Amino acid sequence: MKKLITPFLLVGALASCENATAPDLYTNYINDGEAHPLVILVGGSDGGNYFANPNMKPLMDRYHDYGFSVASMGYFDTSGTPDSPIELSLNEIDARIKAITEDSSIKGQCVALLGFSKGAELSLLLGSHFNTVNHIVAAYPSHVVWNAVKTPMSYSSWSIDGQPLPYIEAPLLSFDMLSGIFTGEYRNAFTDALSEASPKELNDAAIPVEKIKGSVTLVSARQDQIWPSFEMANKIEQRLSDNSYENPVLHIDLDGDHYSYNKETMDTVLTHLKRVMGSECN
């Protein structure tokens, strides 16, 4: 067991060292003296600010082609965010986003939050529980809250008003999680956790996406090897439909894996966002 755990801890330690040097917030705004709509990016389970890497600037510049300013933020393990990924305060993350939207160069009612993987879970939660952001894009999303990453202990990933959110647990030290270190396949750990959860546990952990105030865009992968994003995106769609959700909903299901989001996908997402935001944002 020790031989299996050690590489996992080493990977986590190396990721932490890299993230600690990343800024909490990176901005790439259109600098023409006018206010523009904004897309805020949040990354996956490393919690850092992946999009702040200078190598990502050409990609970030593409948002300008669609009239969007763009920012990216870390939510743990950067210099000014919590070190631990346990019970992260959604209130604090929302307050940080609100401060970003109050910049005079941003149209405050024209903000989209685009999260990837664990960041998609976060984005859906923020849209469901707060009114700061009115358009949510969730790439490789989850319909439920999961346990905290990077810890073998059982904790919720998120909290609101100091209270941890109910969650489904995919144990870090399960066979499927540990073998994934070598195979890159973690999907079974999550599908097993979902199938073994009781109806009450699933209901309690479900993200109340019907409370989102604006458009919902989902991007999933049919061959997702990390977790079942296609099936979970379908659950989100079904919940929205069951609650007679009236805002625009788009589900882009990719014929690929967890890393198949490419420039064409990005163009589709931004074209859709520009349309659903309406003339007041463009």
Task: Describe these PLM feature segments.
Residues 32-62:
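Short, surface-exposed "cap/lid" segments of acyl-processing enzymes
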Residues 23-35, 104, 276:
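Short beta-strand-to-loop junctions in surface cap/lid or active-site-entrance loops
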Residues 83-104:
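Alpha/beta-hydrolase active-site loop
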Residues 64-80:
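Conserved alpha/beta-hydrolase
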Residues 120-131:
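Short glycine-enriched nucleophile-adjacent loop
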Residues 105-117:
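Alpha/beta-hydrolase fold nucleophile elbow
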Residues 128, 135-211, 222, 226:
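Accessory cap/linker subdomain of secreted extracellular hydrolases
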Residues 43, 83-85, 219, 231-282:
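C-terminal catalytic histidine-bearing segment of alpha/beta-hydrolase fold enzymes
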